[in-house]
From Swiss-Prot:
Enzyme class, broadest EC rank: translocase
Protein name: ATP-dependent lipid A-core flippase
Protein family: Belongs to the ABC transporter superfamily. Lipid exporter (TC 3.A.1.106) family.
Source organism (scientific name): Francisella novicida
Single GO MF annotation: ATPase-coupled lipid transmembrane transporter activity
Chain ranges of the ABC transmembrane type-1 domain: 38-319
UniProt KW keywords: ATP-binding, Cell membrane, Lipid transport, Membrane, Nucleotide-binding, Translocase, Transmembrane, Transmembrane helix, Transport
Binding-site residues, ATP: 383-390
ABC transporter domain span: 351-585
A Pfam family it matches: ABC_tran
Family matches, as NCBIfam families: MsbA_lipidA
The protein's Enzyme Commission number: 7.5.2.6
Source taxonomy: Bacteria, Pseudomonadati, Pseudomonadota, Gammaproteobacteria, Thiotrichales
Length: 593
């Protein structure tokens, strides 16, 4: 496929995506077509106005003065009617552009909720947000501005060419000075534009923030089933942005008609002045002849701008096509695979990993991993960085799919379960705690479909050793904790994350311990909170603390994507193998209790 064919195919697909909005656009184009044809006619009408509005020899007679005054009144009425049509046309055309933005941003955001982990691994947050925001704006140019420019300026050019050919060089053009009127009007409009722009930019920042937060925390959103909640939050911010942009469009659409009405009033005033004070029954004023020249000159001057606009259309389309390619890349990206149809109403928490293998491309990460985890057990996975521990937990959650082997949950292959059902039985407490720019209450009740009482949240906070510090916050559990819990300390953020998992009360917990040490007091209360969390569920821990491995029911030592040792702490120490070396090398003895 040639580049020209590719551009044509993409542009055609783009227009098909918004075909349901084309009626909206067609109405705007129709109104533009009518009133731009009238524009060309108005320029030509300078000829009869000046020729028949003056007496023999070009002077002003009583009869021609009456004609001029009638023409002045008629012109104001015509321009006013035309301006109303122009406003309607510009509003519909501008609204079409914003409807395209609104549609594509919704479609892309909804698609992001369904994309697999591999997509987020390949693309940075900035790239994704840029496609969601900036690229969509570029597409707007192709679906509104480019189409309208061809219709609008193409029609105008044709009309002006006709005028130029049928006119003659016999009149000069009145120059209308409207500076003071326009200056005052533009000053008022500019102030309103600045205020609307500030509101729009501020609301767009909220849209960007929510989108970035969603992308950064996509695992938590899915594990806790909060897709709809986050989607509603995003749409609320987007709705406000949309309303501000529509107000801006309306103001922009109003500006040009008002200026034209002011100009027509000045022109009418000039005609009245000539009719009243310029009457000369003896032959008139010869300098007011040559109407055909005036209409030709006006057409010649007016044709420059639409021709310039038409030359810019190709640039607009090329930019839009490049943006469209990126947008369709996201919309066409394969969704997270839903391989299962079974649903388990209740799970005990038995997890069996059989001969599991996985690779990222050519890089083998896991090879023949087998582990049996009984319900209620705490199993600690240890090993140096890159040994496959985190990848294993991601496969359990089905963010990745194994190439070989199987993972069983209570004897059922996890690939046979629906994603929503599987993840409803899992909780995650990440090494890097992910919290949302929301209240303590909403962070802990995050993603739960049922109504959660304040008492339930408080109970979870107490069990997580977090209620004491939450009580001291300005609004208690209804205090906003900032972006990713920025208003809290590291230990406090961890305890909020633990309280969230406690409230969900899933039978299987995946816990990736933080590698950085807390102060002794924070470490103590976090450990107590973890004990409360793990006592009622199966716990899979990526361990970084000596106290964790000492208390685990089983320790699995991984190296190079394989299980090399397995057993209890003391048993492995007595073997004197890789685990003993990792204890001496990797674990800080100050964590031991």
């Amino acid at each position: 496929m040639t580049n020209h064919q590719k551009v044509g195919t993409l542009y055609k697909r783009l227009l098909l995506q918004v075909k349901h909005l084309m009626a909206f656009s067609a109405f705007g184009c129709y109104r533009k077509y009518i009133f731009l044809s009238a524009d060309a006619s108005m320029i030509y009408l300078i000829n009869p106005i000046l020729n028949y509005g003056f007496g023999p020899g070009g002077g002003i007679t009583k009869q021609s003065a009456t004609i001029l005054m009638l023409m002045g009144v008629g012109m104001v009425g015509f321009i006013a009617l035309r301006s109303v049509g122009s406003f309607v046309s510009q509003y519909f055309i501008g609204s079409l552009g914003q409807k395209v933005v609104y549609k594509f941003r919704k479609d892309i955001y909804k698609r992001l909720m369904d994309l697999p982990a591999s997509f987020f691994d390949k693309h940075s947050t900035g790239q994704i947000i840029s496609r969601l925001l900036y690229n969509v704006d570029q597409v707007t140019e192709a679906t509104s501005t480019a189409i309208i420019t061809v219709v609008q300026d193409g029609t105008f050019v044709i009309g002006l060419i006709v005028v130029m050919f049928v006119s003659s060089w016999q009149l000069s053009l009145f120059l209308i000075v409207v500076g003071p009127f326009l200056g005052l009007f533009i000053s008022i409009i500019n102030k309103k534009f600045r205020n609307l722009s500030r509101n729009t930019q501020s609301s767009m920042g909220n849209v960007t923030h929510t989108a970035e937060e969603t992308i950064r925390n996509y695992k938590e959103i899915r594990i806790f089933g909060a897709q709809q909640k986050q989607q509603n939050k995003f749409f609320k911010n987007l709705d406000y942005t949309y309303s501000q942009q529509i107000r801006t469009i309306a103001l922009d659409a109003l500006t040009s008609p008002v200026i034209q009405i002011i100009a027509s009033l000045v022109l009418a005033f000039s005609l009245f002045t000539i009719a009243i004070f310029g009457t000369n029954d003896g032959g008139g004023s010869s300098w007011l002849t040559a109407g055909s020249f005036a209409s030709f000159f006006a057409a010649a001057a007016a044709i420059l701008k639409p021709i310039k606009n038409l030359t810019k259309v190709n640039v607009v389309i090329q930019k839009a096509v490049a943006a469209t390619e990126d947008i369709f890349y996201i919309l066409d990206y394969p969704a997270e695979k839903e391989t299962g149809s079974k649903e388990l109403a209740k799970v005990d928490g038995n997890v069996t990993i059989k001969d599991l293998s996985f690779a990222f491309g050519e890089h083998k990460v896991l090879s023949g991993v087998s582990v049996d985890i009984k319900a209620g057990q705490t199993v600690a996975f240890v090993g140096k960085s890159g040994s496959g521990k985190t990848t294993l937990t991601s496969i359990i959650s089905r963010f990745y799919t194994q190439h070989k082997g199987e993972i069983l949950l209570d004897g059922v292959d996890t690939r046979e379960l629906t994603l929503e059902n599987l993840r409803s039985h899992l909780s995650i407490v990440s090494q890097n705690v992910h919290l949302f720019d929301d209240t303590v209450y909403n962070n802990i009740a995050f993603g739960l479909s049922r109504e959660v009482s304040e008492d339930e949240v408080i109970d979870a906070l107490k069990r997580a050793n977090a209620y004491e510090f939450v009580q001291e916050l300005s609004d208690g559990i209804h205090t906003n904790i900032g972006n990713n819990g920025s208003k809290l300390s590291g230990g406090q953020r961890q305890r909020i994350s633990i309280a969230r998992a406690l409230l969900k009360n899933a039978p299987v917990l995946i816990f990736d311990e933080a590698t950085s040490a807390l102060d002794n007091e924070s470490e103590r209360v976090v450990q107590q909170a973890l004990e409360s969390l793990t006592e009622s569920c199966t716990t899979i821990v990526i361990a970084h603390r000596l106290s964790t491995v000492e208390n685990a029911d089983k320790i699995v030592v991984m190296d190079g994507g394989k299980v090399v040792e397995s057993g209890k702490h003391q048993e492995l120490l007595e073997q004197g193998g890789l685990y003993t070396g990792s204890i001496n090398r990797d674990f800080n003895s100050t964590y031991a209790r």
